[in-house]
Amino acid sequence: SITKIKAREIL
């Protein structure tokens, strides 16, 4: 999922 990866990047 891209959303999970994006959330990881933000955090």
Curated annotation (Swiss-Prot):
Alphabetically ordered keywords of this record: Allergen, Cytoplasm, Glycolysis, Lyase, Magnesium, Metal-binding
Molecular function, one GO term: phosphopyruvate hydratase activity
Catalytic reactions of this protein: (2R)-2-phosphoglycerate = phosphoenolpyruvate + H2O
Listed EC numbers: 4.2.1.11
GO CC terms: cytoplasm
Cofactor annotation comment: Mg(2+) is required for catalysis and for stabilizing the dimer.
Biological process annotations from GO: glycolytic process
Root EC class: lyase
Pathway in which this enzyme or protein is active: Carbohydrate degradation; glycolysis; pyruvate from D-glyceraldehyde 3-phosphate: step 4/5
Domain of life: Eukaryota
Location of the protein in the cell: Cytoplasm
Cofactor: Mg(2+)
Described function: Glycolytic enzyme that catalyzes the conversion of 2-phosphoglycerate to phosphoenolpyruvate.
Quaternary structure annotation from Swiss-Prot or TrEMBL: Dimer.
Protein family according to the UniProt entry: Belongs to the enolase family.
Protein name: Beta-enolase
Protein's gene: ENO3
